[in-house]
Design a protein with these regions (language model features):
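Positively charged n-region of N-terminal signal peptides that target proteins for export
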Residues: 1-4
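Membrane-embedded alpha-helical bundles that constitute the cytochrome b-like, heme-associated redox core
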Residues: 6, 34-42, 162, 225, ...
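Hydrophobic membrane-insertion alpha-helices, especially the h-region
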Residues: 7-20
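N-terminal, intrinsically disordered, polar/charged segments of Gram-positive cell-envelope systems
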Residues: 24-75
Length: 232
């Protein structure tokens, strides 16, 4: 997507250089067209891992001042499962004292849409994906904290951002406000993706706001049921 937008900008710039007659109003109109095109492309379905992570709001989280308060100390809260047994938003005020020291137990929860398949490379298509990663709080076989996600959705995508948080917590001893919002649409059993937000409290050392698309390159997922097929 970034290549497409860059191409549009280069094309417009080349026209401007070629004719050298753009007026301020025309420049504003062209900028508006580019912005509109970017928004339209951002709304389109992303099918490849190269487009799996999308930066939101210029990578700035949208927490309120109340959200960032340390009045309640360290905590984590999970939403109740909905009528379809789907997970909801998960929130936490993280600190390294919450991080586990024991080895993780084997996962056995089967989240909604769990229709496992072995891929051509021998890996399994689906992972049980934590909303709040085990390495951050030690929360394991909690059905309110596990969703069905593709292998590339889980790792490297989600895990990369979880690792950023974990490394910051260990290094600084500071707090991090954390939020993960799974993106279920209609009555679909598999989320289209998840938004991950983090903001360090005592300093500005960590901050991100990304949307990770629940896709796997080479496969088409039926988000309604969790079924999948090889992409033609």
């Amino acid at each position: 997507m970034k290549k497409i937008i860059s191409g549009i900008v280069v094309f417009i710039g080349a026209i401007g250089i070629g004719i050298g007659v753009f007026q301020p109003q025309e420049v504003r109109q062209i900028t508006s067209i580019v912005d509109q095109t970017f928004n339209e492309l951002s709304d389109k379905k992303v099918e490849h891992t190269s487009d799996q992570v999308e930066v939101k709001n210029h990578n700035k989280p949208t927490f309120s001042s109340k959200d960032l308060s340390l009045d309640k100390g360290n905590w984590q809260v999970f939403s109740d499962l909905d009528s379809l047994n789907r997970v909801g938003e998960a929130n936490a005020m993280l600190h390294k004292s919450m991080m586990p020291t024991e080895e993780r137990e084997r996962l056995y929860i089967k989240p909604t849409g769990w229709k496992q398949k072995k891929m051509k490379n021998g890996d399994y298509l689906y992972n049980r994906c934590y909303l709040i990663g085990y390495q951050l709080t030690g929360e394991n076989n909690n059905p309110r904290n596990l969703m069905t996600g593709t292998r590339s959705f889980n790792t490297p995508a989600m895990v990369e951002y979880e690792n950023k948080v974990a490394e910051y917590l260990r290094r600084t001893g500071n707090h991090v406000r954390y939020r993960v919002r799974p993106d279920f649409r209609g009555n679909e059993l598999v989320a289209r993706g998840a938004q991950m937000e983090a903001q360090s409290i005592e300093d500005n050392g960590l901050s991100f706001n990304v949307y990770i698309h629940n896709t796997q390159e080479g496969y088409v997922i039926d988000y309604q049921t969790g079924s999948s097929r090889v992409q033609n």
